[in-house]
Every structure is written in C-alpha cells, then in structure tokens.
Amino acid sequence: MTFEQLIPLIIMAFALGMDAFSVSLGMGMMTLKIRQILYIGVTIGIFHIIMPFIGMVLGRFLSEQYGDIAHFAGAILLIGLGFYIVYSSILENEETRTAPIGISLFVFAFGVSIDSFSVGLSLGIYGAQTIITILLFGFVSMLLAWIGLFIGRHAKDMLGTYGEIVGGIILVGFGLYLLFPI
C-alpha cells in the first residue's frame, strides 16, 4: 500500500471515529474509573474492526457480482451516510447518557460502529486492503474514544455535535470523490 492510498484511509478512519469521540465526550462527563475508560475504548475499537470487516466481505461479493453498479452504490452509500450523520447530529437533543456496562456496552459500541459497516461495504466494493483498513479503523476509533472520555472528564460540551458533523462532511466528501475522481 502506497502513502497516497493510506492517507484517505487515515482520514476516513478519523471521520468514522468522530462519532465515538463525540459520544465519548458526553459519557466522559460521568464518573468513570480509568479502567472503565480503557475498557470502553477497547470495546469500541474492536467493534470498529468487526463491523467494517463484515461490510468489506459483503462489498467484495457485491462488486464481483454487480461491477459498476456496485461502485456507484458504494459512493452513494457514503454520501447518504455522511448526510445522515450531519442531519441527525444537528437535530439531536441533548439527552442524559449513562455509562454503558455489560451488554449495554456492546449495544453502545455496536451503535457507534454501525456506520463503519456501511463504509466497509463501500470499501469492499472498491477493493481496499482489508487488514490495514480494519486495523486502522479500530485503532483510530479506540484512540478517539479514549481522548473523548478523558476530555469529557475535564470539560463539558467542547465539541459534541460538531465532531459528528465534521465526520459526516468528510464521508460526503469521500463519496463525491468516488463518484467524480479528480
């Protein structure tokens, strides 16, 4: 993999991780032990490996079966997902969040990683390198979740919704780039 191929994946990993970062900011404002913070971040990272992997496998299958139609659908999926993230971030009401424990942690991690499934689907259609991609997504999401949790412990409402909006805009940009390569 060349440096030029790695840069878009790194940017996309940060875009996907912004959702985990934003939610972790709010969660970090609760009383959490360091061990809980580490465990939450690792769980989010693992889900950001599993979900895009499943998406990439499915995306490769669709690409082999449907070719150009699958490429177009992958780009549209990224654009739609990006707009959805921006839209839902703007309309989201500030609700009280509780620290996820046990099964609720898995549900939480699944929720913040569901967008990585869609991105994985698109990347699978385009034939991205699986191992590098999913490890990068997992590591960056884990790191951003930890950063969000630690910042949330010390500050209130620094980025919140704005972090999700930036992530959504980046996904729209990548979708447009796939539709109209420069």
Curated annotation (Swiss-Prot):
It is found in: Cell membrane. One of its GO terms (molecular function) is manganese ion transmembrane transporter activity. Keywords: Cell membrane, Ion transport, Manganese, Membrane, Transmembrane, Transmembrane helix, Transport. Its main location: membrane. Probably functions as a manganese efflux pump. Belongs to the MntP (TC 9.B.29) family. This is Putative manganese efflux pump MntP. The lineage of its organism: Bacteria, Bacillati, Bacillota, Bacilli, Bacillales.
